[in-house]
């Protein structure tokens, strides 16, 4: 499936999602409009129940809307069936999850190769291995390709997950709370990888409830009550954190993050 290089990578219009439980209807999304251009780094925020997880599932082709349109990389995926959405997912989206989702008895390089097997790309085993090792090198894991997950730290396991998401060269990286299981220092290092990938031209969509993590993006979309409540550029994205050097004693303090608006906490939103 081909797409126009001039088309936005994500184009959502009047998107609604209604869940029906017996006679009860729950309106999770109520007419969302959202455009993400190629090469953007967008953080989507919102408290529990805001609709951000539903929006993520639709962006990731894990679910489809009740009404409205969603074009991914120029392709209208709004009404595709499950098998068609699976094909689009494998081709267009690289997922990174909070829980890493690595196969415990499989080496790092083999974990990264999995999407190449599912994608039916026709690659030989040596070609898959080469692409896997290149992806691991790209996220700073050269020399650890043959390690099992149990031999890697949490941050290193998440790097493997990012490499796995990258290996098919997807249109977007979709990261769902990728630092949720990491300490603050390791979180900074992992988010720095996303910044590096974005600087190299990769489109990144990050789902998070943490303002400190969203501050690394270049744009923040805040979802509330099933609608896009705020959609603003960040004046100055938070600086990358090379090896967490700024957190070490004697290191320079990081500059304050300049938001063009105040990001409300979940507690403030639900009041």
Predicted regions and their residues:
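Flexible, glycine-rich phosphate/dinucleotide-binding loops
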Residues: 213, 229, 237-238
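ABC family nucleotide-binding domain
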Residues: 8-217, 222-223
């Amino acid at each position: 499936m081909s797409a126009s290089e001039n088309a936005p990578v994500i184009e959502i219009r009047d998107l609604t999602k209604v869940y029906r439980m017996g006679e009860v209807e729950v309106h999770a999304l109520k007419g969302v409009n959202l455009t993400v251009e190629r090469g953007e780094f967008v953080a989507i925020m919102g408290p529990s129940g805001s609709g951000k997880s539903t929006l993520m599932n639709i962006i990731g082709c894990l679910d489809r809307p009740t009404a409205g349109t969603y074009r991914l990389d120029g392709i209208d995926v709004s009404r595709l069936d499950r098998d068609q959405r699976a094909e689009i997912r494998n081709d267009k989206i690289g997922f990174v999850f909070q829980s890493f989702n690595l196969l415990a008895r499989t080496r790092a390089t083999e974990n990264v190769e999995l999407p190449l097997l599912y994608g039916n790309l026709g690659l030989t085993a040596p070609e898959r291995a080469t692409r896997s090792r290149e992806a691991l090198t790209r996220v700073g894991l050269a020399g650890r390709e043959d390690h099992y997950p149990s031999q890697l730290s949490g941050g290193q396991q998440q790097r493997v997950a990012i490499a796995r998401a990258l290996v098919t060269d997807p249109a977007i990286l979709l990261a769902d709370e990728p630092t949720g299981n990491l300490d603050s220092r390791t979180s900074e290092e992992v988010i720095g990888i996303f910044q590096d990938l974005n600087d190299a031209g990769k489109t990144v969509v990050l789902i998070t409830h943490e303002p400190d993590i969203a501050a690394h993006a270049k744009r923040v979309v805040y979802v509330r009550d099933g609608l896009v409540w705020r959609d603003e550029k960040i004046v100055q994205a938070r600086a990358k954190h090379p090896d967490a050097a700024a957190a070490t004693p004697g290191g320079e303090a990081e500059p304050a993050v300049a938001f063009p608006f105040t990001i409300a906490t979940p507690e403030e939103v639900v009041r």
